[in-house]
Amino acid sequence: MTNIRKTHPLMKIVNNAFIDLPTPSNISSWWNFGSLLGICLILQILTGLFLAMHYTSDTMTAFSSVTHICRDVNYGWIIRYMHANGASMFFICLFMHIGRGLYYGSYTFLETWNIGVILLLATMATAFMGYVLPWGQMSFWGATVITNLLSAIPYIGTNLVEWIWGGFSVDKATLTRFFAFHFILPFIIAALAMVHLLFLHETGSNNPTGIPSDTDKIPFHPYYTIKDILGAMLLILVLMLLVLFMPDLLGDPDNYTPANPLNTPPHIKPEWYFLFAYAILRSIPNKLGGVLALVLSILILTLVPFLHTSKQRSMMFRPISQCMFWILAADLLTLTWIGGQPVEHPYIIIGQLASIMYFLIILVMMPAASTIENNLLKW
């Protein structure tokens, strides 16, 4: 009798993806973040579903409905803070996952990489719209500032912004549609994640050496299932430490003040995971230029596979490229810090230099480093 796991139409898909999947024997903990992202997504959908049962997407009651969730709903506070801090964990895993892809040359799987970039954009859109829903000061002004950026688009800009707002300012219509989109997008992300996985399983996983590992594969279960469970336990540990001991560490105190269109907060800034892009946006004095730089700061990832000049796939044996990679990581941390600072000297010039460095490293310095390494190896 054949195993039902290998014959049943549905079980067969699960089996080939998570049980009998041939996996490189040497993939490190950097390969854990894919499964952690899946866990984050499931966690966000579940906590979000329970929050949506009590939330009202009306400007008059949105803020008080969130207060009601925290004060009156059974374990509402933990659901709310798991959702808010779950988003932070999601982005930490995302950045680690992308960093792994850049370091080990995983971007040469073109379809997988490009769907990953689309997933990043969709997740950023979802997180932005979710931040608007509590209808605090930073929710309102963040929504106003970020949607207003579209007015920089020539000719159609103003009409486009008013169309998104559903009126002449961020108001009831905006909040309602943001709630609708915030609810539907995670399911689109889940579908895209399945396509992401589908394309990955066409080629098989990369590994730290960047050398094809067809001659040395092991089954995913039990080796990597147990490894993923360890990763998941660590993820949940960090998340629960945040939720139970410092739930507001990564939030903005301004969001505990109800939205007031007549009172602008002194420093409008998004959540920490958008600060690097926000710093790039602010570092260009021209509005349209800033918006283009903001969009390109993410879309530049689609160019990375075409800028790969090295004869080796991974950076494991390329010290100069490794140096460039870690300079890029430090530059992104600098941009994140600058994004949270007021627009004044010396932060302006630091932000401008860090923004130039960001594009310079990816577009010029990394390909140049690869070429130098090729020549040093006489390839």
From Swiss-Prot:
One of its GO terms (molecular function) is metal ion binding. It holds the Pfam family Cytochrome_B. Binds 2 heme b groups non-covalently. The chain crosses the membrane at residues 33-53, 77-98, 113-133, 178-198, 226-246, 288-308, 320-340, 347-367. A ubiquinone binds at residue 201. It is found in: Mitochondrion inner membrane. SUPFAM superfamilies: a domain/subunit of cytochrome bc1 complex (Ubiquinol-cytochrome c reductase), Transmembrane di-heme cytochromes. InterPro entries: Cyt_b/b6_C, Cyt_b/b6_C_sf, Cyt_b/b6_N, Cytb/b6-like_sf, Cytochrome_b, Cytochrome_b_C_euk/bac, Cytochrome_b_N_euk/bac, Di-haem_cyt_TM. CDD domains: cytochrome_b_C, Cytochrome_b_N. It is a multi-pass membrane protein. Heme b b566 binds at residues 97, 196. The keyword Electron transport applies. Heme b b562 binds at residues 83, 182. Its main location: mitochondrion. GO terms for biological process: mitochondrial electron transport, ubiquinol to cytochrome c. The cytochrome bc1 complex contains 11 subunits: 3 respiratory subunits (MT-CYB, CYC1 and UQCRFS1), 2 core proteins (UQCRC1 and UQCRC2) and 6 low-molecular weight proteins (UQCRH/QCR6, UQCRB/QCR7, UQCRQ/QCR8, UQCR10/QCR9, UQCR11/QCR10 and a cleavage product of UQCRFS1). This cytochrome bc1 complex then forms a dimer. Component of the ubiquinol-cytochrome c reductase complex (complex III or cytochrome b-c1 complex) that is part of the mitochondrial respiratory chain. The b-c1 complex mediates electron transfer from ubiquinol to cytochrome c. Contributes to the generation of a proton gradient across the mitochondrial membrane that is then used for ATP synthesis. Belongs to the cytochrome b family. Heme 1 (or BL or b562) is low-potential and absorbs at about 562 nm, and heme 2 (or BH or b566) is high-potential and absorbs at about 566 nm. This is Cytochrome b.
